[in-house]
From Swiss-Prot:
Function: Component of the large ribosomal subunit. The ribosome is a large ribonucleoprotein complex responsible for the synthesis of proteins in the cell.
Subunit structure: Component of the large ribosomal subunit.
Location of Phosphoserine modifications: S31
Protein's recorded name: Large ribosomal subunit protein eL29
Native source species: Sus scrofa
Amino acid sequence: MAKSKNHTTHNQSRKWHRNGIKKPRSQRYESLKGVDPKFLRNMRFAKKHNKKGLKKMQANNAKAMSARAEAIKALVKPKEVKPNIPKGGSRKLSRLAYIAHPKLGKRARARIAKGLRFCRPKSQAKAQSKAKATAGGTAAAPVPPASAPKGAQAPTKAPQ
């Protein structure tokens, strides 16, 4: 009778290594960085078997983490707080550079020009110029003398 081929050992190691040898779960994900690998393993088993020890284990781990944080706080000296200086000038320069750029600034320049066109109130500007003209006409303003031909002397006052 021929041997059953259900349980083969052929190419098994290749299958295992196809995805590479994986890192521990604590190093695999950014969110699990610094978490005890033993704790993660226990969590897996606890999820698998739904044990009551899960809550106790979590409480113990939380205590350990808080103790660790306190120890780190005690060891690390507090740094001097530097005053935060706002970076206003660099933003202004970068904006100007963007506007001056031949391709990128095309739309920005168009928007600025459009804004200037729309924001300038034409009726107010005309009204202000008219008001200045009327105010200047009523007040006694010195009228400039008629221009003399080029090279002519200015007229002198006659003695009385």
